[in-house]
């Protein structure tokens, strides 16, 4: 298991908002924070799935350096889309963070890892595996649009979206 480290990020969402208010979108505060890292940012990569995390695994198997995986699970609370094994895969492949419009599981273990994950809640139920979903399309939830190649910034205060890199 990969445990949390003392990592610092050179921004806060509050300061980013104050300095860039006219060009940012702010997600509604619906997410819980999981993992040992609480701040992250990167280029948006999107998935649209429903109760099937096959595409999550496929995406996390590639190099995610400088990228944040946005998983639109249609806000389903019936099963988890990310667990400790996928969190470890994300760490191994250098993903900056994951935002899940749905649930995660293994939260106790994930909270000890050097990973940043935002999700709606937890569920012990695993997802189905049918390899159904869409990759790199605009997804909308939490009152904002997550568009591939744009940028997301997240910390304990919230989630911001920008068309350009700010830090």
Q: Which residue ranges define each predicted feature?
A:
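Feature captures the catalytic cores and cofactor-binding loops of soluble hydro-lyases/lyases
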Residues: 2-148, 165-167
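Active-site/ligand-binding-proximal alpha/beta "capping" segment
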Residues: 154-167
């Amino acid at each position: 298991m990969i445990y949390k480290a003392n990592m610092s990020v050179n921004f806060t969402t509050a300061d980013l908002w104050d300095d860039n208010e006219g060009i940012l979108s702010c997600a509604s505060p619906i997410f819980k924070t999981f993992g040992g890292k609480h701040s992250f940012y990167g280029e948006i990569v999107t998935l649209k799935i429903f109760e099937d995390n096959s595409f999550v695994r496929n995406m996390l198997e590639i190099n995610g350096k400088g990228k944040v995986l946005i998983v639109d699970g249609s806000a389903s609370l019936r099963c988890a889309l990310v667990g400790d094994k996928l969190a470890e895969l994300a760490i191994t492949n250098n993903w900056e963070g994951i935002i899940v419009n749905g649930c995660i599981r293994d939260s106790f273990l994930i909270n000890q890892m050097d990973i940043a994950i935002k999700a709606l809640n937890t569920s012990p139920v695993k997802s189905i595996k049918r390899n159904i979903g869409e990759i790199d399309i605009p997804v909308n939830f939490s009152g904002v649009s997550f568009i591939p190649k744009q940028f997301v910034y997240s910390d304990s205060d919230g989630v911001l979206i920008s068309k350009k890199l700010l830090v």
